[in-house]
């Protein structure tokens, strides 16, 4: 039943709605300014500046919400406004959004502000946006004609090489390219190698999103090729080959490759979008099946992603009947983890008490999760969604899970009618725990898992992350076969750690002792000792020593620490090194620096490529 008033008579209701929308508009203006500034930082090669910009943007949303709440409380005494006025506030807000370019994000901002002011019992359809009120279909861009949401190119007129070159130059990047003709030839060769020669259909065209996607040391051109009924996704990373000189590093042509660069284990892109829903819709066409919640999150609108995820969860609960259960695997000392088998996520709660040897607090653990949220995750640390006051139907909770919840996290529980309200939780993508993957896998699986594990830890080292607890159970294997770290309660900056070699035993008694015969400080790490708990399985040992024998050498860890202390930032590639043009077409890069006249665009067979 609709309880909304027939007439909107409250001036205060309109004023509050307008104040809240002004708060959102300020937030989104700052959000876009960050993406615009990312272009300048990328052009200058200011990688530390880009890192700081990405970190600061993550906290910007909550800061704008708090500003808006404070303003509403100071000017309107918002907590004392009665329910009839709150109903009108929402209706006025809907009216103000009818021509807005980011209505879905503005609705989420409204919810965030309301949930700071109102008690949970008021979170109902009348007061907040449980479902979207404004459609995001066919929202038009207000930008100049030079920057629509995406540009369409028609290679039939000027040829594919000229079209590809125009696509790149239209982004008007300040640095020069080392050899754009060479790089375009590599793109054409890669397309030919992947798909062969195709006939052009009458609708043959290339669509390219008008903004670059910035992350780490790369800027990505993202688009799709249309030919007949076929749609081919692509992404082209641009990188500095030396200060002030750019090159196209590769072209990613497989959906799986794009899913990895847009995955939950990577940091959010910096990308300028006037109409975010149009970008999300476009990205959905090149990554079909990827939830909109994850796409919004990957482009930096994590609060909108979080909102959509919760709606997806509620929708799934209403169309499923299985029960939440304790997650399979070894139970953690710090976190209680449960899952819904039909839903590909896990729910993680910080326990009330931690048995020895754990020495930590709830606040410290939450700070570790916030550290990961703000850090560059490099595709090796799982992103988390943090929620408060999540109501789950008691009937959907397995009895064993309820007993575990009441035993381990009673302070987080509140029964409310037929629901169990959980005061705080983290939600992550469900992965196969690495220990189970290794335990149940064949020899090929074990080799892959160990190779990935070593790569993951080494990349975390380079990103200044020391995992702390490196047992296999704290890592997971994604659906793409990548190993990702997801247990953060002991995480530290590598630069805060003291890398040490194990001192030689002083005598036979030391050598036979089960306890260290040397002093161990709180931040001391001893890589030589890790083999004790990592190499028990002969298959694991064989693969480990084949691919990562240096893992247990303190010099490796110290070398990474020294590079970090010097302010050096290594290169990371969220795709196989073999896919880089300099590796798959090395003949094109011979004497690149000194070559005066570039080679032709492509070999004869590639010049006549017809894209499908």
From Swiss-Prot:
Residue ranges, annotated region (Disordered): 593-612
GO molecular function: [isocitrate dehydrogenase (NADP+)] kinase activity; AMP binding; ATP binding; phosphoprotein phosphatase activity; protein serine/threonine kinase activity
GO BP field: glucose metabolic process; glyoxylate cycle; tricarboxylic acid cycle
Keywords: ATP-binding, Cytoplasm, Glyoxylate bypass, Hydrolase, Kinase, Nucleotide-binding, Protein phosphatase, Serine/threonine-protein kinase, Transferase, Tricarboxylic acid cycle
Binding site residues for ATP: 327-333, 348
Family, as annotated: Belongs to the AceK family.
Listed name of the protein: Isocitrate dehydrogenase kinase/phosphatase
Species assigned in the record: Paraburkholderia phytofirmans (strain DSM 17436 / LMG 22146 / PsJN) (Burkholderia phytofirmans)
Gene: aceK
